[in-house]
Amino acid sequence: MAAKEVKFGNTARQKMLKGVNILADSVKVTLGPKGRNVVLDKSYGSPVITKDGVSVAKEIELEDKFENMGAQMVKEVASKANDEAGDGTTTATVLAQAIVNEGLKSVAAGMNPMDLKRGIDKAVIAAVEELKKISQPCADSKAIAQVATISANADHTIGEIIAQAMDKVGQEGVITVEEGQALTDELDVVEGMQFDRGYLSPYFINNQESGSVELDNPFILLIDKKISNIRELLPVLEGVSKAGKPLLIIAEDVEGEALATLVVNNMRGIVKVAAVKAPGFGDRRKAMLQDIAVLTGGTVVSEEIGMELEKTQLEDLGTAKRVVITKDNTTVVDGNGDDTAIDGRVNQIKQQMEDTTSDYDREKLQERLAKLAGGVAVIKVGAATEMEMKEKKARVEDALHATRAAVEEGVVPGGGVALVRAASKLAELRGDNEEQNVGIRLALRAMEAPLRQIAMNAGAEGSVVANNVRAGEGNYGYNAGNDTYGDMLEMGILDPTKVTRSALQFAASVGALMITTEAMIADIPQDDNAGGMPGGDMGGMGGMGGMM
């Protein structure tokens, strides 16, 4: 085991503070509409230019082990805020830096760190309640566009396109962000349920122009096993043929004799039919088949529930207004499922999303939810260069997360005003002793830090702006974009309540832990030269010639 170096008390805290300040100073320059860019060197390819706080934080690794510990703890604040609300990483970092700097001054002056921590916790709990009181619902398209614009660093085109996407697919719908091919941003909307499986044979194609299969008012057979024997399918094919409607088969696979017979029947016009593989694998495939069944009003033919393909009736088949199948995708439009059953399925998936601990599972459940409840919108980001594309795509993703957070918990005045208002309401808050009171005042003072930093990045004097905003009431605040004061909501400067709340809670949590640090332990750096192989021994290799 490697030898360790241990630092205690103020020496340890000062080292940690230095790391905190290096990381926070690098991140906080990006805050606000006049925030600056940070250039990140990459070992491969061109440098990356970003205004995304968490991207900057992730790049920072310090040589000194003790300083690095401080930096990594603040990096955790940014990551947690990003995971919880998808935005607010820079605000969280600025708050954490302010709490740690103020807190360590008080500890150095001889105050009890544990009482300071209790005071900070008390102030944050009260501030979160105040934020909830001043929060307003964010329901209309205009407010959504404003939130997205602010999060995308005042880019109105991004705000508008996200608002359009939410209008089209609803608040439950899935919105994905991709790199586009054009110079401008584009929005593609897929209505109905789409999954990434195409036709099993090109002989099913009936629209030669688009190279797709189009079925109007088809029956839909859902089965969770492979079909290779055509005899199993004959009763269904006969029933569908008599009804004079097309048939879509969604199965684990259709192969051999069964597929060949379907192709021949389709080409001869005996029955209009197409087959695709079921989406997903394993348990996820079963769940998605059940989703399609609920959406189309059908039943999944499964031996697990005692159903056999030979005994399947027309009543067991789902129906939809239209199905379009391309080489890669199948889209079911206007399934004829029962609305109550669909709502029940949606609620079931929402419950699973709450229960799961896996981010991957949650993402897949969100996709399934969107396909049932709304639709899928794809924002294709346009830019002139690859460097600009990457930077812009990151901003669009941030804006999308912020918008979802706003819809979830509402909005508060932006530009750091909400935290200033919450702090001013808590001027009378008291702890159990004087040191807790210092902790409370310390946290309330730190809550002004984001506003001061936004002003400083815009070239204004932070203290003057903070005093002017404190003198106002309600939504009155400072618009750093054009250096004016006024009603933040009327000027369209909004922050999602969830983003502001998460930033404050995570910053206070980690900041208070750092204040209470009394010892730090790290590996002693190894001297690389000391471990080198002695050069003299290799001389003996010359004698190997005598072996020949």
Swiss-Prot record:
GO molecular function, one term: unfolded protein binding
Enzyme class: isomerase
Example of a GO cellular component annotation carried by this entry: cytoplasm
Principal location listed in the UniProt entry: cytoplasm
GO process terms (BP): protein refolding
InterPro entries tied to this protein: Chaperonin_Cpn60_CS, Cpn60/GroEL, Cpn60/GroEL/TCP-1, GroEL-like_apical_dom_sf, GROEL-like_equatorial_sf, TCP-1-like_intermed_sf
Keywords of the record: ATP-binding, Chaperone, Cytoplasm, Isomerase, Nucleotide-binding
Pfam families reported in the protein's UniProt record: Cpn60_TCP1
Annotated catalysed reactions: ATP + H2O + a folded polypeptide = ADP + phosphate + an unfolded polypeptide
Subcellular location: Cytoplasm
Positions with a binding annotation for ATP: 30-33, 51, 87-91, 415, 495
Signal peptide positions on this chain: none
Coiled-coil residue windows: none
EC number: 5.6.1.7
NCBIfam families xrefs: GroEL (TIGR02348), PRK00013.1 (NF000592), PRK12849.1 (NF009487), PRK12850.1 (NF009488), PRK12851.1 (NF009489)
Entry similarity comment: Belongs to the chaperonin (HSP60) family.
Entry function: Together with its co-chaperonin GroES, plays an essential role in assisting protein folding. The GroEL-GroES system forms a nano-cage that allows encapsulation of the non-native substrate proteins and provides a physical environment optimized to promote and accelerate protein folding.
Known partners and oligomeric status: Forms a cylinder of 14 subunits composed of two heptameric rings stacked back-to-back. Interacts with the co-chaperonin GroES.
Protein name, UniProt field: Chaperonin GroEL
